[in-house]
Amino acid sequence: MKMHSRIFTILVLVAITLTTSLFIACGEDNTDPTPVTPPQEEPEKKPGDKQDEEEEDETEMSDTNYNISSIVFPIHRNAGLSETITIYPDENNLFTERVYSVRYDHTRPYMMPASLSKLYIEFNSDAKTIYIDGVEYKKNTPYDFSKPVTVTACADTGTEKSYTIELKNFTGLPIIYINTASGQEVKDKENYEDATIEIIGSESLPGLAKMDMQIHGRGNVSWTAFTKKQSYTISLSSKQKVLGMPKHKKWVLISNYRDKTLLRNNVAWWISSHMPGIKYTPRFQHAELILNGRHRGVYQVVEQVRIDNDRVDINEMKPTDTEGEAITGGYLIELDRMSDDTDQWRWVLPYLQGGSHQANIKKPKIDESNQAQHDYIKDYLFKVDKLLGTSEDMEYVMETYIDMPSWAAQWLVFELSGTPEPNGPSSWYTFKDKNDDKWYCGPPWDFDYQSFVPSTANQFRNKKYVYQPQMRKYQPYREELVRQWEAVQPLLPDLINYINEQREYMRHSAEANWFIHEQNLKDDESHQNGDEYIPSDMAIDRMIEYLYLKWDYVENNIRNLK
C-alpha cells in the first residue's frame, strides 16, 4: 500500500506541474505567495464513484471551451471593407482569406485592396482569454494582419490551442501604386509626366519604397484602340531592383488587354528562354496596378528593351563614337511597320517584305548631333538588306553578316506561338555590336496578338517573312532551325506544367482583372484571339490544346521546310 501511495503522490505532483505550465503559457501569473500545501494521501476511489464521474465530466467540458469556431472582420468597424468577412479554420487551425473591397465608378464596379495593417477582429469562441502574437486580445484595438499572426485561445483549466490567421492582400500579387502629379489619366505617349510609385510586395517578391518617377503611354495599336486598359513606360528617378529583377530605371507596364489567358507573353518568353540561340529574354513579373487611386487590373512588369549588361548586352555608344572601331556599335534596331515614314532617321528597307517595313534605330538616339552614326548604320543595313534580297552567294551573306542561331531561334519563337507578327512586325528587335559585322536577332517581343489559336497550329504561319525565304536557301541555316527546335522539343511537358502553375498563381488576379474588363474585351470588335467570350480557364486549356497540335506539326515538318 505504501508503494501505491508514493506513485499517487508523484502523479499528483506531475499534474500540478503540467497545469501550472499551461497557465503560464496562457498568460497566468504563477507567483502566488501562498505556500503550496503538500498533497495529502486520499482514500482509494472505487470505479463508478459518482463524485469522480462529475469531476471528469466538468474537466472535459472546460477543456473544450478554447476552440475558435470562426473569426469576423465586421464592416461597421472596418471602413476599408465592402462587406463583413467571416472566416472558418481549416483542419490545420489556419484562418486564411483574400481581403479586398469593391468600389464603383460611374456605376461600374472594380476591386481595390484593403489595408491589412489596422483591422478590428472579433472571435466566436468560449475561450477564457485570447492572445494575438502573445498580447491579450482587446475588442476595441485594431491589429496588424499584413503578416501572419498567431492566436492562442485559453480554456478555464489553462489548456491552450493555437491558430494562425493569414490574410492575403487583395489577389496575392504585388501591388503597384502610381500617382501622377496632375491626378489625371496618362494621355501622352511621347512626353513623360511626373509621378510617384510605391510597390507593396508579396510573400515571394520584394516591394519598393515610395519614390519619384515619370510615366508616359506606350504601344501602337494597343495605345489607340484599347483605351480602357493602356500600357505605360515608366522611368524611375534612380536605378532600382523591381520585384526582384536587376536594377534599372526603365520599365514597361504591359496591359495584356486582349489576352484572356493573361499568359501569352509568359509562354512565348518561356520558350525563348529555353532557345540556345536567344541571348536575352526580357524578365517580367505580374502585379496589380493602382493608378491615381483606382485599380486598373493586372499588369505585366517587364524590363524595357535597352542596351545594358543585364539586358541587350552590347557596347553602349557615346555621341563622340564617330569613327574607326568606335562607330561600329552597338546599335539596337527595331524592324517596325508602324514607324512614322516621314522621320528622316528611319528608313524603308527595300528587300524586307517588298519594301513595306522600316528600320527604327532605338539606341543610340540618332539625330543631327550624331550624323556619322546615322550614316554608318544606315549604310550597313542597306548593304545587308540588298545582299539578302539579291545575292546568289548566300554562303557569303549568311556566314559574314547573319548570326544564324539568333535569327533561327527568334523566328521559331514566333512560329511556335502562332502570332503573325513577323508578317507585319511592329516590334522585331535586332542588334549589331561593336567590332562585329554580324546582324543579330532579339529579344522576342509582343505575343498578345492572334497567338496560340488552335486553328492555326497545322501550318508554318510565318515562313515567308523577315528574310526567311532568302535565308532558307542556305542549307546550314535550315539545319540551324532544326537544332533550335530540337533544344525545345522535349520540353513540352515542362512548359505545360509551367502554364498550370501560372494559372493557379494568377487565378485571383485574373478574376479581379476580368471583373473590370470582361465587358470591355467583349465590346472590342477585333476579337483577334478567338477566346474573348470564354472563361480564363477555358482560354488557357485552349492554349494548351494549341501547343500539343503545334508541337506535333513542327516535329513532323521542320526537317522538310524549304
Give names to the regions the model predicted.
Residues 223, 227, 358-424, 428, ...:
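Middle-to-C-terminal accessory/interaction subdomains
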Residues 177, 231-235, 245, 250-255, ...:
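Structural recognition of the beta-strand scaffold that forms the well-ordered cores
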